[in-house]
């Protein structure tokens, strides 16, 4: 995630893969006594950032920070693929025909993954980690390269959401599959934070983790939370579009920061589980606006995998607000649907 401080009217620039950035002027307060508090720190190998409006009935930043960091610690303990003692990595280490008791939040994410896998015809899949490792993009990767046919066929036997099942409070598998929640974990963390804020009486906030975010309410001066969608460029950060967000999660997935080239072909980290290989279409990035940050997170990945035609049709069918950036020879072109435009203008109907 790229992070920079702007010197000027807007103070904070945050992005994931350089695709999604947040712009929010940090104010000390207004005459009504409300103040805009902000803090952040490391999480999930990246960064999180919180801004919220504090008034007489809401807790101070020290208490709120403790709540947020407890949530992030829970997410890390449950979902991280970079620590061997996490719930999901202990499950991943089990052989075929094994089961493990899982916390309810983990089982709920498995259900979400099953839903997205089914609706995408198997293109989206939470069990692609062995493929990511094989191609050089995963947590146990050694080298970025196109794998051999035999190696790919062998690994694909351990990929597929159909190998998973939930049995009461247990997650079970009939093959040595490995689950990777990276496509929805950060969005899930943001939703957990948003739910906790609601319980604490915090109704105006912008919560962001590794670039996934949700915003609600208004800043103390009455202005909206503003989110900038960055043009997909490797060399610098340039805002493609600035939108206002209230009550929605926003997520961008792009294919242009993590990739390698071999024999004249460009391979990105966006994997189609149906083929076992990276996608090769011209869709560079997808931004999704959704009431749930977790669903925005997962759907932006799903639509990027499906590509410019199938992804667009999926978004229209399911009334999902989307903003596409596509490659057109040596330039980029953008496309957004009516749902995206309506929501980004602050209209819900």
Model-found features: residue ranges?
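Mature catalytic core of soluble alpha/beta enzymes
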Residues: 2-8, 13-15, 23, 28-349
